[in-house]
Amino acid sequence: MLKNLFRKTKYITVSQKNIENYKRENTPTIPDGMWVKCNKCGEILYQNDLEKNYMVCNLCGNHFRIGVKERIKYLFDKDTFKEWDYKIKTENPLDFKGYDEKIEHIKEKTNLSEAVTTGKCKIAGMEVVVCIMDSKFMMGSMGSVVGEKITRAIERAIGLRLPVIIFTASGGARMQEGILSLMQMAKVSSALAKLDEEGLLYICVLTDPTTGGVTASFAMLGDIILAEPDALIGFAGKRVIEQTINEKLPEDFQKSEFLLEHGFIDKIVPRSDLRKVLAKLINMHQNSF
């Protein structure tokens, strides 16, 4: 009996490689991109359901940032969008180090030519000129090409006697182009002044984020200014302002709800209602075109 008590215990050696193989074989395979975490409430959302709901969380109403393709799909009549000026090439006028390489990398990554896409389309059968900014392209920053494309679109709208809708999503002027990027603020604003003189409608839809030079120029010049819920809209950053004035700002400062309350915008429109609201506004102003 004592002999059996001190006998060496038998065991099986399992290598780390065998454990990894077991885990790999017994772990369910889930394709990438099927599930998305809401950055507001933390809920895990099924990608297909999220897309059907206009990229809006069905629990907390958080509006995910969307790009050009999604806006065209959700808002405009099918197969009516005709893009303009997509061949305009971004230059490096200041020979800013690494700028050319960065632009080419972002072009490949996003499949976009620049931070704004312009063109003509139809909403509920009515023709409009649209400019759609995309924050995925260098945070939607406004450089020479962005200003030129928006200006050309406005000038064409004047010639065609069509209303203009601009969807803003930008971090402001593009620092790599220096004063040339800041000049676009005046350039686009001047084109919008001509549009106004012609009695044509300009609707601006502010989306998250709309900041810097874009906010300080054409984003706030709309005849009608709409915004998506909970969108960040401002000029300088909240912390910069707090440090400058030595005061604590409200929690919802620079949010679309705060701007509506203080009279800076006309209406907050959920993404699911935006097509209907835009169609109604354009239809109301048809006689002025």
From Swiss-Prot:
Record: residues binding Zn(2+): C38, C41, C57, C60
Subunit structure: Acetyl-CoA carboxylase is a heterohexamer composed of biotin carboxyl carrier protein (AccB), biotin carboxylase (AccC) and two subunits each of ACCase subunit alpha (AccA) and ACCase subunit beta (AccD).
Highest classification ranks of the organism: Bacteria, Bacillati, Bacillota, Clostridia, Eubacteriales
Domain spans labelled CoA carboxyltransferase N-terminal: 34-289
NCBIfam families given in the database record: accD (TIGR00515)
Record-given protein name: Acetyl-coenzyme A carboxylase carboxyl transferase subunit beta
The organism of origin for this protein: Clostridium botulinum (strain Hall / ATCC 3502 / NCTC 13319 / Type A)
Cofactor binding note from Swiss-Prot or TrEMBL: Binds 1 zinc ion per subunit.
Function: Component of the acetyl coenzyme A carboxylase (ACC) complex. Biotin carboxylase (BC) catalyzes the carboxylation of biotin on its carrier protein (BCCP) and then the CO(2) group is transferred by the transcarboxylase to acetyl-CoA to form malonyl-CoA.
GO biological process, one term: mycolic acid biosynthetic process
Localization annotation: Cytoplasm
Enzyme class, broadest EC rank: transferase
Reactions catalysed: N(6)-carboxybiotinyl-L-lysyl-[protein] + acetyl-CoA = N(6)-biotinyl-L-lysyl-[protein] + malonyl-CoA
Zinc finger (C4-type) in chain: 38-60
Superkingdom to which the source organism belongs: Bacteria
Annotated pathway: Lipid metabolism; malonyl-CoA biosynthesis; malonyl-CoA from acetyl-CoA: step 1/1
Gene field: accD
